[in-house]
Design a protein with these regions (language model features):
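Conserved glycine-rich cofactor-binding loop
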Residues: 22-23
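Substrate-binding pocket helix/loop in short-chain dehydrogenase/reductase
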Residues: 105-106, 113-118
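Conserved amphipathic alpha-helix within the SDR
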Residues: 54, 58, 65-68, 73-89
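Catalytic loop of short-chain dehydrogenase/reductase
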Residues: 126, 141-172, 184-191
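C-terminal helical subdomain
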Residues: 182-239
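Conserved NAD(P)H cofactor-binding loop of Rossmann-fold oxidoreductase domains
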Residues: 97-103
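Conserved glycine-rich Rossmann-like NAD(P)H-binding loop of the short-chain dehydrogenase/reductase
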Residues: 38-52
Length: 239
């Protein structure tokens, strides 16, 4: 469980939108913001997953609103922000978790998969930053979680570089009271217990302890996941 001092973080009753909240890093980040008193907008392309994590957030004693939204589709992005404004009249922060995965070797990458990667991570980050500039005019934060470093193929590295460029550019044009930063995990998500270092950084960047921190890309070294028994170990245990 990821716990912080609420007084130190200053997240009580803050309105925080978490994309990709239904799974992986997004789910863990949403739960941690909830534990620290924030109202969490759980956004996911799968409405059932958005609703499920919203239910988990409410079980933690926080307020949650699920919204089905694909951040690579500009109309979905606009509708998501408009709905948040209708419900709350304001937004304090955004955590956008990029979601594309590719295990395809670079020499075998096809055009269709390349465009899917661009849509899922670069377009979505651009759209979220665009709306963030509009809806966070009173101050706040945008934290982007980039593709993990363990994905070493050149096309994934290019995606990371593009998102990093968006963070740098947004920092130059956003008001100084809006903090835009990025987090790069060392590996893919495996579960809240083993991903807590990433979650702590994502929550800290949205809190008062990071006031004035802008344009940073923070690499987070996560512990290796627990060893999974090989199939022959499992077979050995059968009667």
């Amino acid at each position: 469980m990821v716990e912080f001092s609420r007084d130190l973080l200053g997240l009580e009753q803050r309105i925080v939108m978490v994309t990709g909240a239904g799974r992986g890093f997004g789910r863990s980040v949403a739960r941690s913001y909830a534990r620290n008193g924030a109202t969490v907008i759980t956004v996911d392309p799968d409405v059932e997953m958005a609703t499920a994590i919203a239910s988990e957030v409410e079980q933690l004693g926080a307020t949650a609103i699920p919204i089905r939204g694909d951040m690579s589709v500009v109309l979905d992005v606009m509708n998501t922000f408009e709905k948040i404004e209708e419900l709350f009249g304001m937004l304090d922060g955004i955590v956008h978790v990029t979601s594309a995965e590719s295990k395809t070797p670079f020499v075998e990458l096809l055009e269709g998969e390349w465009y899917d990667l661009l849509n899922a991570d670069v377009k979505s980050s651009l759209y979220v930053l665009q709306q963030g500039l509009r809806y966070l005019s009173g101050g706040g934060f945008v934290t982007l979680v980039l593709p993990p470093l363990q994905r070493e193929q050149p096309h994934v590295a290019a995606i990371r570089g593009a998102v990093a460029g968006l963070i740098e550019g947004a920092t130059r044009i956003f008001p100084t009271n809006v903090r835009v930063n990025g987090v790069i995990p060392s590996r893919d998500p495996v579960g809240e217990e083993h991903d807590r270092s990433l979650v702590r950084v994502a929550v800290a960047l949205g809190s008062m302890v990071s006031e004035g921190v802008r344009g940073q890309l923070l690499e987070v070294l996560l512990p290796e996941p627990p060893h999974q028994p090989e199939i022959y170990d499992l077979l050995r245990e059968l009667p």
